[in-house]
Amino acid sequence: MLRHNTTNDGVVALIVPGIGNSGPGHWQTLWEERHPGWQRVQQRDWDRPVCAEWLRGLDAAMARLSAPPVLIAHSMGCLLVAHWAKRSSLPVRAPFLVAAPDPAGPMFPP
């Protein structure tokens, strides 16, 4: 039987949404509600991503954490984590990347 773990078990997790900040019914938001100790990256503008600004938002969130986190990223958040990992020496427990967009695709923002 598969059971859902509703405790944090000491896991530090950081939710990294994509464009729109994963609204109320989104799986990232539901997971955050189930795990009140988890944190979420904050961005100034969730609808117009600017790589340098979003990297600063991720840096700020990482600075608040007590241990290397599981980075739970969705969509544009996956690309943010990839860019951040190239330039950061901070450790992470694991990346959990879901539905990374194709930057060469027609739906990708300019």
Region roles according to the model:
Residues V70, R93-F96:
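Residue in the alpha/beta-hydrolase core beta-strand immediately N-terminal to the catalytic nucleophile
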Residues H83-R87:
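Active-site signature of alpha/beta-hydrolase-fold catalytic machinery across serine-
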